[in-house]
Design a protein with these regions (language model features):
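Conserved ABC ATPase signature
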Residues: 152-156, 160
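Short coil-to-helix segment of the ABC ATPase nucleotide-binding domain corresponding to the Q-loop/switch region
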Residues: 111-119
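A short, proline-enriched helix->beta-strand linker immediately N-terminal to the Walker B motif
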Residues: 171-175
């Protein structure tokens, strides 16, 4: 990994390749994410954005390349082209450094809001209930939903459910947050409250990778923007530069279509 001062990147993805049903979904994607980076990943549907995100925490399995999370190797490819993952327990531990928020919220419907937050810290991390509850309540307060602590997800709006999902991911105290189109399933009037929550995390210097269709959010909140098309990173630059003067014709065409 490139040494920037005393730190190394939180995530290094090198030449990630993935095939699916005979087609190449990812064609050699490389990206480094440093502490405090907020990276927006944009691009047309089917460009591999979500697949790449899901490869980072092993929800998808890569066919070739290297994934290093906080200096620990999750997957690597040998000289013969064989891709190997860290042993399962180790892979799980490495992936716990990353919190994930999905398009579809994925809250446990049979648990209250508070129970949704304390479940994983108790079962996965083995933390005591008494220690977890104050932290969970603080996170609910942070996303503006402490009053809903005893409600069930079905009683919440989509925007509220997604904010709970963000709080639930944060309850595991990750170093990196991955967002997979967090507002795509929401009614337009509810996207703002979710984006405000993500913006607040950016202000607190949480390291984030956000796959999004929200161009204003990508331009205003992210430190850099990655444009993907057809399984490749076409352009990765500081947000202001990419939006004001895209270097690649495909980026330009996409932005003209979106803005």
């Amino acid at each position: 990994p490139s040494m920037k001062g005393e730190t190394f990147p939180l995530i290094v993805a090198r030449d990630i390749r993935m095939h699916f049903g005979g087609s190449d979904v990812l064609k050699g994607v490389s990206l480094e994410i440093d502490k405090g980076d907020v990276i927006a990943v944009i691009g047309p549907s089917g460009s591999g954005k979500s697949t790449f995100l899901r490869c980072l925490n092993h929800l998808e399995t890569i066919d070739a390349g290297e994934l290093v999370i906080e200096g620990e190797t999750l997957a690597s490819t040998d000289a013969e082209g064989v891709c190997r993952y860290a042993p399962e327990a180790e892979a799980r531990r490495i992936c716990r450094k990353m919190g994930m928020v999905f398009q579809q919220f994925n809250l446990f419907p049979h648990l209250t809001v508070l129970q949704n937050l304390i479940e994983a810290p108790m079962t996965v991390k083995g933390m005591a209930r008494d220690a977890v509850i104050p932290k969970a309540e603080a996170l609910l307060d942070k996303v503006g939903l402490l009053a809903k602590r005893d409600a069930y997800p079905s009683r919440l709006s989509g925007g509220q459910q997604q904010r709970v999902a963000i709080a639930r991911a944060l309850a595991m105290e990750p170093d990196i947050m991955l967002f997979d189109e967090p507002t795509s399933a929401l009614d337009p009037e509810l996207t703002g409250e979710v984006l405000r929550t993500i913006r607040q995390l950016a202000d607190e210097h949480m390291t984030m990778l956000v796959v999004t269709h929200e161009m204003n959010f990508a331009r205003d909140v992210s430190t850099s923007v990655v444009f993907m098309d057809n399984g490749e990173i076409i352009e990765a630059r500081p947000a202001g530069e990419l939006f004001s003067s895209p270097a690649h014709p495909r980026t330009r065409a996409f932005l003209e279509h979106m803005l």
